[in-house]
């Protein structure tokens, strides 16, 4: 026997490969209040038992690797390993299972969404034993929530800053999204804000291109919003997109926005990354700036039902990383979004405590403790005829954002803004009087048209515009 063999035998180390389920499938495990809990939709390869697939997810996203290693003996795997503690078959789907995994809190760096995602979804999605894998939900324990700053300000502070209460906020994305000069861009901002909108917005891919450098855009937009504020007596904002190629450049743009005295900046949090987003959120908290978040690239990650990460997880991650607004779909517009699923993650964005509710896709009860809420932003293919439904679906604590539905008005940008403001005020008034927006919505809009020619013109233009496509991501039966 060689010295090497003698050494291995003497420490009881047995090399080789063993099934994951022998170590990481623990149906007897009782979850702890401090565990991060995950619900994965697992589609195993043919011949792979669901218990082995669920255990493989737990192993590869925590302490495991493909073979036994001698350094396992230098730590306590029982303390640090992830555990697949329950598996459910998905009704109506062949070979799909929900695998529940518990992770000890010590596996994660405090205050770092980047580290949390690197661990839980960083490597396991390419695992050959799985045909497909989707992270459906996470339960973030209060002990971990308290390590995050979260949104720079939150819903109530934003309302106080803007002095706007009792209704949804109104916004507009400036179109065309690319190609305008900074001066023409600022002109559109001014006209929309003067017409009655609360916000205008840079589109997600407006950064600092040759046709419009960021500093020029910031200057003209600031001039526009201050002029609109003076004329209307209302506080206005424009989401100045600070997203950039480096964190240093991003912060430089946010600093310039603060020096101009504007109330809000913007970030593309998925393409920009969670580290950049958290950095910007901390700057905004320290310097009194609101932070609007765009979810560009989300559908690459969340749209397919059997693979990726559900948006409710990305929404939770954003609330932890930091943002005062985030785009959340519309239910009624041009973009993907089933009603019950959308309302489920809207509640996860806004509320302090959300109960488990599988009918809305919420797998775990979530307690946000004292983390501020985030305003959901309904944007994408919406117009004045959608206003009753949007007001009823999203309620007061939301931003309703009409891009083409403002700038596409036949009389111009300011009349388009007037039409949207009149429609919103009519819907809020009707709701407060006890009328049913879902049933009487069209009638409410027609009544308002009688005293608003701008709204009447908008209603005529968009009276036949609908987006009747079934959602791809729907609830399980």
From Swiss-Prot:
Pfam families: RuBisCO_large, RuBisCO_large_N. Belongs to the RuBisCO large chain family. Type I subfamily. The active site is at 175 (proton acceptor), 294 (proton acceptor). Its cofactor is Mg(2+). NCBIfam families: PRK04208.1. HAMAP family: RuBisCO_L_type1 (MF_01338). Keywords: Acetylation, Calvin cycle, Carbon dioxide fixation, Chloroplast, Disulfide bond, Lyase, Magnesium, Metal-binding, Methylation, Monooxygenase, Oxidoreductase, Photorespiration, Photosynthesis, Plastid. InterPro entries: RuBisCO, RuBisCo_large_chain_AS, RuBisCO_lsu_C, RuBisCO_lsu_C_sf, RuBisCO_lsu_fd_N, RuBisCO_lsu_N_sf, RuBisCO_lsuI. It comes from Solanum lycopersicum. The modification N6,N6,N6-trimethyllysine is found at residue 14. Mg(2+) binds at residues 201, 203-204. GO terms for biological process: photorespiration; reductive pentose-phosphate cycle. The modification N6-carboxylysine is found at residue 201. RuBisCO catalyzes two reactions: the carboxylation of D-ribulose 1,5-bisphosphate, the primary event in carbon dioxide fixation, as well as the oxidative fragmentation of the pentose substrate in the photorespiration process. Both reactions occur simultaneously and in competition at the same active site. This is Ribulose bisphosphate carboxylase large chain. It is found in: Plastid, Chloroplast. Residues 1-2 form a propeptide. One of its GO terms (cellular component) is chloroplast.
């Amino acid at each position: 026997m060689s010295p090497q063999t003698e050494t291995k035998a003497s420490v009881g180390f047995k090399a080789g490969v063993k099934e994951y389920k022998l170590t990481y499938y623990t149906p007897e495990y009782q979850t702890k209040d401090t565990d991060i809990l995950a619900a994965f939709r697992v589609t195993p390869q043919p011949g792979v038992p669901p218990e082995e697939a669920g255990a493989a997810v737990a192993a590869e996203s925590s302490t495991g690797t493909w073979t036994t290693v001698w350094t396992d003996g230098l730590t306590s795997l029982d303390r640090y390993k992830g555990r697949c503690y329950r598996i459910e078959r998905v009704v109506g789907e062949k070979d799909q299972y929900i695998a529940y995994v518990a992770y000890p809190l010590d596996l994660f760096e405090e205050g770092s969404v980047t580290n949390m995602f690197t661990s839980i979804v960083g490597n396991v999605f390419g695992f050959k034993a799985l045909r497909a894998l989707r992270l459906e939900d996470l339960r973030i324990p209060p002990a971990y929530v308290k390590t995050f700053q979260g949104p720079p300000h939150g819903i109530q502070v934003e309302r106080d800053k803007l002095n706007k209460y009792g209704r949804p906020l109104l916004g507009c994305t400036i179109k065309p999204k690319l190609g305008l000069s900074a001066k023409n861009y600022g002109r559109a901002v001014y006209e929309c804000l003067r017409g009655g909108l609360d916000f205008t917005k840079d589109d997600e891919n407006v950064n600092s291109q040759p046709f419009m450098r960021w500093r020029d855009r910031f200057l003209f937009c600031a001039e526009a919003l201050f002029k609109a504020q003076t004329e209307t007596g209302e506080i206005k904002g424009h989401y100045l997109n600070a997203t950039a190629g480096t964190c240093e450049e991003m912060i430089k743009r946010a600093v310039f926005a603060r020096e101009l005295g504007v109330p809000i900046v913007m970030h593309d949090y998925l393409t920009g990354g969670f580290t950049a987003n958290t950095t910007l959120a901390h700057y905004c908290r320290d310097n009194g700036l609101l932070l609007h978040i765009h979810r560009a690239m989300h559908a690459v990650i969340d749209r397919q039902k059997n693979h990726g990460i559900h948006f409710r997880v990305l929404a939770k991650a954003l609330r932890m990383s930091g943002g005062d607004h985030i785009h959340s779909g519309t239910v009624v517009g041009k973009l993907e979004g089933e009603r019950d699923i959308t309302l489920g993650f809207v509640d996860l964005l806004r509320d302090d405590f959300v109960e488990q509710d599988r009918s809305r896709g919420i797998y775990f009860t979530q307690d946000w403790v004292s983390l501020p809420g985030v305003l959901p932003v309904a944007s994408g293919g919406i117009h004045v005829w959608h206003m009753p439904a949007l007001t009823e679906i999203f309620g007061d604590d939301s931003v309703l954002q009409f891009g083409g539905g403002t700038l596409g008005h036949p009389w111009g940008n300011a009349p388009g803004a007037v039409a949207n403001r009149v429609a919103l005020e009519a819907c809020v008034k009707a709701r407060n009087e006890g009328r049913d927006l879902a049933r009487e919505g069209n009638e409410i809009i027609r009544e308002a048209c009688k005293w608003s020619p701008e709204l009447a013109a908008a209603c005529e233009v968009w009276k036949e515009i609908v987006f009747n496509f079934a959602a791809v991501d729907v609830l399980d039966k």
